[in-house]
Amino acid sequence: EWLQCNPDKRDHQQLRNWLSKDQVQSTQVLIGQKTKPKMERWIRLLKPDNPNNYVSRRKTKKQQIFEILNENSEICWSEVQNRVNAPSQALKKLKEDGHIEFFEKRVYRRFMEGGLPEIEPFKELTPEQKSVFEKLSDSLKNGTYRTYLLEGITGSGKTEVYLHAVREAHKLGKSCLILVPEISLTPQLVNRFRSRFGDHVAILHSGMDDGERFDEWSRVRHGFASIVIGARSAVFSPMKNLGLIVIDEEHDPSYKQGETPRYHGRDVAIFRGYEAGATVLLGSATPSLESSNNVSN
């Protein structure tokens, strides 16, 4: 299934190579009913009606529907039901007369309901932040794998560096993966990204129901969202043209999964960055011994 949905042919070949060398093992697991896309019934105007056909002072249901469709040539069935009392028979007659047609449109279930937060401007970077960002920018433009460790206490401005780096990658047409510990995946953090990048941001974590996760995953897979924010399992997101991976609080033990399949989200992210030729940025106030040792060497 992964081979069928993953768009990167290089990944296909790499996985086949690992399988042929017995470096990975293929298993079969029976799963329950799959989550399906959520569909809504919509109405499309095909042939406007002549208003002279109606001489009554009181608007008929057909007239009300035509007025709505003149404002929006396509509209959700439920919206018409909200604005016109019991419209089913009138809609059926309009369809028979060839004025309208019914069709289904996919809608995406979103974990964070409501509109996008108010747009926030990017803050000007301090000299120290700018020095870090310039290195990240050069790496992104070169398109070669590099890993960096950014050490700074909470509130020191690491997130603002992340935001600027994501904007740079976004300008270059590259997708971005931001991993954070589950406990840190707060609405405030997510809205800092959504207020700057809008619907390009997708969220993936365990607090979502199956439908919400499925739809966010689908938005990423189809390229509607190029910036993913999530906990450790988000590292497996089906991203195209991956250019930047940020692992915040890289020392956090929650990146390790104890259940099968066991993996370390940070290490998988670094390896994925290596395979994709992406820039990887580790951030922490107290870096892990492994990362500190890698920097020293």
Question: What kind of region is each of these model predictions?
Answer:
Residues 1-286, 290-292, 296-297:
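Accessory, non-ATPase domains that flank or precede helicase/AAA+ motor cores in DNA-metabolism machines
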